[in-house]
Amino acid sequence: TTIRIMLGLLKKSKGIVSLFDKDAWRDSLDIHKSVAYVPGDLTLWENLTGGQTIDLLMKLHGNGDEAKKQELVKKFNLDLSKKVKSYSKGNRQKVGLIAALAVDCDLYNLDEPTSGLDPLMESIFQDEIARLKKQQKAVLLSSHILSEVERLADRVVIIQEGSVVESGTLEELRHLTRSTIHLKVTNEVTPLSSLHFIHDWSQIDQNQATFSIDHLSMDNLLQVLTEYQIQKLEILPPTLEELFMRHYQVQK
């Protein structure tokens, strides 16, 4: 819904929505000249070939790069001669991605862009996003594949039931939840389990344990550990999936 409102495909119920200092609804035609879009529910012309479809989409946008298109076709290994109706879900997705990535614009608006792609094609997509970032292009990526967002995003917005519940860099969001600690010491590790700031305690043997700790308690832990002879200390920051799930569980 948010993406559709930004593109002027839906009218907002209240508030202000603008892109490039232009009203998303009133100035949508002007905004579209600066935006490439891959929808989550990609619908194409069944009787056109893949090549014809890409050419048409690029022509409609008006700022396509033929050389870049050919490069992307080769990278994504797409047969342009086949009709769209014969394409798999993944190949249909490639059509949309090639058409969007082959145009030069200021904002690339991608809604579930890797749906249907195999891991190799996902890797190629990620390389293309890295290229756009180097060119200082803006990319808005909507995805339920949190590992993908974690690899690609500079800033993350978590939306739940239509409202923004968290927003910031991944590093900023990690401060909101717990890190996982793997600890091995030469002396007995058990006394640590009784500390009030230690959670999810799992003892491997008398010298090793795994547990979690809030960001604000990290200094307390390090102070306590000065009394131990440490053989191994591994601190794993939370993944985006862990951040999301913990926030969801707290809300429930």
Predicted regions and their residues:
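Catalytic Walker B motif of ABC-type/P-loop ATPase nucleotide-binding domains
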Residues: 108-112
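Short, charged/small-residue-rich alpha-helical element at the C-terminal edge
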Residues: 179-251
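Helix-to-loop junction immediately C-terminal to a conserved catalytic motif
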Residues: 7
